[in-house]
């Protein structure tokens, strides 16, 4: 099977993740800079693969399968590493847990609804959620470099990143509820048909 360019980009995003993890543990300046650039590059391929698939009409079932998996691997890995090194700490960890829980929930819902041949369309709000999520993680990855570059009164890169992470968590709850409602409605509908 010949791989299409959007699929190659998606696979590339998955391949970036272990490199991202390894560079995260480099001490000092490069330990902040390299993971940041790798995460931004991987996030950009998420936008680019979808755009190219639509422009060149190269949307595929493989792309539909791999794209959300690649996103979840990237985001989950970044959040776990940021919690592990103390960038996300104390009550902020709740925001990370909300985001990760929603991703697991949606994966299960997609599989359940797919059996009923119901497509879970990505909404504009979900796309906004993803953008804010990626932006917050990217800012948090800048570490001390980001804090030196962005420092206005009580707001530095870390503070802005955490605020955006909480906003992302709120949008995650809202969009997750919408998907969950569709899943529950479908399950009730199926049970009703079986009881007849």
Predicted regions and their residues:
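C-terminal membrane-associated helical module and adjoining short loops/tails
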Residues: 1-7, 17, 27, 35-43, ...
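Core segments of transmembrane alpha-helices
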Residues: 12-19, 70-79, 106-107, 129-141
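Residue-level signature of the transmembrane alpha-helical core
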Residues: 14, 37-40, 69, 97-100, ...
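Active-site His/Glu-centered metal-binding helix of metallohydrolases
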Residues: 15, 44-52, 69, 73, ...
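Membrane-embedded alpha-helical segments that form the functional core of polytopic membrane enzymes
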Residues: 16-65, 78-98, 156-171
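A cytosolic-side transmembrane-helix exit/cap motif
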Residues: 54-59, 111-122
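Membrane-water interface of transmembrane alpha-helices
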Residues: 104-112
């Amino acid at each position: 099977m010949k791989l299409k360019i959007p699929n190659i980009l998606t696979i590339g995003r998955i391949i970036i993740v272990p490199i991202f993890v390894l560079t995260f543990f480099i001490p000092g300046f490069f330990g902040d800079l390299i993971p940041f650039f790798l995460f931004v590059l991987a996030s950009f391929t998420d936008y680019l693969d979808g755009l190219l698939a639509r422009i060149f009409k190269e949307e595929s079932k493989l792309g539909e399968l791999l794209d959300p998996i690649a996103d979840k691997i990237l985001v989950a890995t970044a959040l776990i590493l940021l919690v592990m090194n103390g960038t996300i700490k104390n009550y902020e960890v709740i925001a990370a847990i909300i985001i990760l829980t929603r991703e697991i929930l949606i994966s299960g819902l997609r599989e359940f609804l797919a059996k009923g041949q119901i497509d879970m369309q990505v909404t504009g709000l979900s796309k906004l959620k993803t953008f804010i999520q990626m932006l917050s993680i990217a800012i948090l990855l800048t570490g001390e470099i980001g804090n030196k570059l962005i420092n206005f009164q009580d707001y530095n890169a870390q503070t802005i990143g955490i605020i955006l992470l909480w906003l992302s968590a709120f949008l995650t709850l809202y969009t997750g509820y919408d998907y969950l409602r569709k899943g529950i409605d479908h399950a009730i509908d199926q049970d009703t048909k079986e009881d007849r």
